[in-house]
Every structure is written in structure tokens, then in C-alpha cells.
């Protein structure tokens, strides 16, 4: 029987499947951070259990960390406790930890791929909803809750039902200047922020195949934002070239054997998907969200839609509420809207290619008066590479703040946040009410669009700069 990529990876990991019961699958990689792990470690301790596979477990500090200092207490008492607890737990249970002073420290979903921890055909979990990022490699990667974190720690397995399958194809070539972030925002705008609920989505088509690995990670990172369980992209030569030579990647003959297997990881001809969506790459323009979920998105040169333009009553109500929260009007152009802050970072867009794209816009320009602009590299490795290329100097000379790695302003769990009423052009993945700070107003954009907003003081079409 013809199988999809998802079905192949899922089936390869089934440990036990009995009729009438949820399948038990093996987990190949477990990524851990300071926020969702403390209770899981406590659970192991309470039952006198050991960690089943410390060699398949990696931990880092990212959510709570300060991006201005390596001081563990800089983000407050709760943050300090969580990070100190993670360090103590990792020491007790034998987990490798990349703490604030380690050269591999960074956002967990940036760290995993750049170190070769993330590999095609593997199952990867983390107590974080954007674990879908790793699906860019053809892995089955998804976020789990703290009780499931404990279950994986104790057994290296997880009960998982089979999801429905959706293929989203982006056909044709992207226009110049259109990024992976624009692609995925356009997809979410088309499918809706809940359109993928119950599905594992495979992204396909010429435009997806033409993306770099970092671009593919951006797309899969936001699969959760259309409601999907996970997002996947079939591995190819681009994937193999990216993995080769990474710290934890296979080497020598083992790598060649792995490549032979990875090349089989694609949906078979005739494989049946439960849903299919097709977009034309030529139709995708630079995107900006206007509302309070990622599906409320338009091209930068389009007017904000009227609530009455939506056929669904719930969508109409959501649009009215979003416009009120965002202090926007139907018909208004986002190019006429001034901003207060810019955030370039997060597990969606903090990799070296993202910083290069933003720096290309920032070069020779200045941050607009009254705008605070932060650039937060996704890891120490990214930071070092950017500094070796002189990107930090470009940003600093333009008036951006060059920060230390961390989740930063993506979520209001550290000192980087919006004040009530502040409007932010952000390269992160969520624009929910209060996501970046109480009563803050978030607009999701690509790194280039964020840099353009910083230097113009409002949302600007990068094609016109």
C-alpha cells in the first residue's frame, strides 16, 4: 500500500499496537528546557525512576534567559529558580545541559538542528509547541505536555494516535524577496489558524523544495499555527548537505547507510492524503498579520479586511475583537501604521540566514526615531557566525540592539516585552493577545520586513525599498 511520509515514519516507530488501544511509539530524541521539565524530573524522583535514555536527551536554557547579561538571576526570581532547578536535575539524572555559559546554548529548536541532533526519519519531542520545527528534516516532531515529558524520560516511548494527513503544495517559483515566513503566513491565511487541526501536514511543491533548510524550518515551525499536530518536509540533497559534518550527525559509513534510508523517506506515488491544499507561489507577496491570530494576515499592500467580508460568523466576531484590540480600522493600510518596537529573533526566524536578510535591509540605514529594535540570535553558534560576518556591526551602526541568545520577546517570560499599547513588528510565530506583553500589539513579519519596519518606522514593502 502506498504510504505518506508521515505514515512511513510513524509506522517505523511503533513499539506496540493492539486493536482498540492507542499505539505506543518509540521516541528517538528528547529536547528539554527549563520551563516544562521541573515537574517531570520530580515525578521520576518520586517514583525512584532513572532516566531511560540520557544519551538521547539534550537540555538547554532558553525561555527565561536574559538577552543582556549571562546573570542567571537577571530575569527574576522564578526564572532563576527554574534555571537552577534544570541544572540540578540534569546533573542528578545525567543529562547533557547547554547552560548560559556553554558554546552550544540557544533556543532549543535552533540548537537541535545546528548540532545534528535533528535527523530525517526520527521522532522528536519537547515540552514546547514549536517542536514541529524539526519536521523540516523529514522527522516526526511535536510538542508534548509535562506529564508526557515524564513518560518519555521514564520509558523513551509515548502513546500516540494516528493523525489525519494533509498535503499543502506551493507550486511554482517565489518572486524575488519573498521569504519562507511569507510563504507560511500565506498558507495559514489560506487554511486558517485551525484549518490543520487533527492533521500532520506535509509541505511540498517546487517553492518548498527550493527553500534552504533554514527556510524549511521556518515553515514547519509554524505548522502548529494552522492547528496541525506537526509539519513535515521530505528530506533531499539539501537536507543531507546541511546535516553532513554536524556535531551529532552520523559519520563515515554510518552516514552513508543513513543517507540510503533517508532517501526512501518521501510520500509514495499514489499515497492518499485526507486533505490537499494548493497555492501558487507567484501569488505570494510580503505578509503582515493585522489581527490576533496568525490566520488574520494580508499582503503588506492590501487594506485590512472588514469583518463583514468573512462568511463565517465566528470569524466576523473574531475580526471585530481583533481590530478593537489592535486599534485598527477596516480598509486601513498597514503601511500607514507606525510601530514602536521591532523584534528579530525566536525559533521561527533567528538563524544566520534570517539575520543576513535583516542586515541587508539595515545596511547603511538608521532605525527610525522613537523605535526600539532588538536583534536576538537564536544560539551562541548563530551569534558567533553573525559576528564573524560583521552582521552585528551592521545592526549596531544602524541603531539596532545586538543581544545574547534566547527566546526573548517572543513571549513575555523574561525582561524583553511590550508595554501596554505598544505595537511591534515581530519575526516570531504568535500574535495572540498579550503574547509579547500585557496589551501589546504584535504583527508577524519576515526578518527583512521587520528590518524595513525598523528603519521606516512603519510597515514597508521591501520590494519598494
Swiss-Prot record:
Residues that, per the record, bind [4Fe-4S] cluster: 347, 407, 410
Protein name per the record: 3-isopropylmalate dehydratase large subunit
Gene: leuC
Function: Catalyzes the isomerization between 2-isopropylmalate and 3-isopropylmalate, via the formation of 2-isopropylmaleate.
Lineage, highest ranks first: Bacteria, Pseudomonadati, Pseudomonadota, Gammaproteobacteria, Aeromonadales
Cofactor entry: [4Fe-4S] cluster
InterPro entries (alphabetical): 3-IsopropMal_deHydase_lsu, Acnase/IPM_dHydase_lsu_aba_1/3, Acoase/IPM_deHydtase_lsu_aba, Aconitase_4Fe-4S_BS, Aconitase_4Fe-4S_dom, IPM_dehydratase_rel_enz, IPMI_cat
Key words of the record: 4Fe-4S, Amino-acid biosynthesis, Branched-chain amino acid biosynthesis, Iron, Iron-sulfur, Leucine biosynthesis, Lyase, Metal-binding
EC number: 4.2.1.33
SUPFAM superfamilies with a match to the protein in the record: Aconitase iron-sulfur domain (SSF53732)
Family assignment from sequence similarity: Belongs to the aconitase/IPM isomerase family. LeuC type 1 subfamily.
Amino acid at each position: 500500500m502506498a504510504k505518506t511520509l508521515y505514515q512511513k515514519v510513524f509506522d517505523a516507530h511503533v513499539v506496540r499496537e493492539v486493536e482498540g488501544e492507542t499505539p505506543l511509539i518509540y521516541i528517538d530524541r528528547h529536547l528539554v528546557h527549563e520551563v516544562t521539565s521541573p515537574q517531570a524530573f520530580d515525578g521520576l524522583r518520586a517514583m525512584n525512576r532513572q532516566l531511560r535514555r540520557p544519551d538521547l536527551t539534550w537540555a538547554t536554557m532558553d525561555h527565561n534567559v536574559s538577552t543582556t547579561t549571562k546573570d542567571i538571576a537577571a530575569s527574576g526570581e522564578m526564572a532563576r529558580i527554574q534555571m537552577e532547578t534544570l541544572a540540578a536535575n540534569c546533573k542528578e539524572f545525567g543529562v547533557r545541559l547547554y547552560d548560559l555559559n556553554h558554546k552550544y546554548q540557544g533556543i532549543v529548536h535552533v540548537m537541535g538542528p545546528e548540532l545534528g541532533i535533528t535527523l530525517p526519519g526520527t521522532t522528536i519531542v519537547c515540552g514546547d509547541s514549536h517542536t514541529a520545527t524539526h519536521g523540516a528534516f523529514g522527522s516526526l516532531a511535536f510538542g508534548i505536555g509535562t506529564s508526557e515529558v515524564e513518560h518519555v524520560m521514564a520509558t523513551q516511548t509515548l502513546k500516540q494516535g494516528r493523525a489525519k494527513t494533509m498535503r499543502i503544495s506551493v507550486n511554482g517559483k517565489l518572486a524575488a524577496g519573498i521569504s519562507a515566513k511569507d510563504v507560511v503566513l500565506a498558507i495559514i491565511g489560506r487554511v486558517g489558524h485551525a484549518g490543520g487541526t487533527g492533521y500532520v501536514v506535509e509541505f511540498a511543491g517546487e517553492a518548498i523544495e527550493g527553500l534552504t533548510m533554514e527556510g524549511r524550518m521556518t515553515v514547519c515551525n509554524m505548522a502548529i499555527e494552522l492547528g496541525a499536530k506537526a509539519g513535515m518536509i521530505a528530506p533531499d540533497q539539501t537536507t543531507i548537505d546541511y546535516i553532513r559534518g554536524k556535531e551529532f550527525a552520523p559519520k563515515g559509513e554510518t552516514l552513508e547507510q543513513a543517507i540510503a534510508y533517508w532517501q526512501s523517506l518521501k510520500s509514495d506515488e499514489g499515497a492518499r492524503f485526507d486533505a490537499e491544499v494548493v497555492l501558487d507561489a507567484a501569488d505570494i507577496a510580503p505578509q503582515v498579520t493585522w489581527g490576533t491570530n496568525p490566520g488574520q494576515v494580508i499582503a503588506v499592500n492590501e487594506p485590512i479586511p472588514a469583518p463583514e467580508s468573512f462568511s463565517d460568523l465566528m470569524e466576523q466576531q473574531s475580526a471585530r475583537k481583533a481590530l478593537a484590540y489592535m486599534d485598527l480600522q477596516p480598509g486601513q493600510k498597514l503601511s500607514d501604521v507606525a510601530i514602536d518596537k521591532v523584534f528579530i529573533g525566536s525559533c521561527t526566524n533567528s538563524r544566520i540566514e534570517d539575520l543576513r536578510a535583516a542586515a541587508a535591509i539595515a545596511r547603511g540605514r538608521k532605525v527610525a526615531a522613537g523605535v526600539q529594535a532588538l536583534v536576538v540570535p537564536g544560539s551562541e553558534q548563530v551569534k558567533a557566525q553573525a559576528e564573524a560576518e560583521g552582521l552585528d556591526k551592521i545592526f549596531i551602526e544602524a541603531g539596532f540592539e545586538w543581544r545574547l541568545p534566547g527566546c526573548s520577546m517572543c513571549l513575555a517570560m523574561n525582561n524583553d516585552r511590550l508595554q501596554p499599547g505598544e505595537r511591534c513588528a515581530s519575526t516570531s510565530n504568535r500574535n495572540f493577545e498579550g503574547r509579547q506583553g500585557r496589551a501589546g500589539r504584535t504583527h508577524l513579519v519576515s526578518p527583512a520586513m521587520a528590518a524595513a519596519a525598523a528603519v521606516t518606522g512603519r510597515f514597508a514593502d521591501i520590494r519598494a525599498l
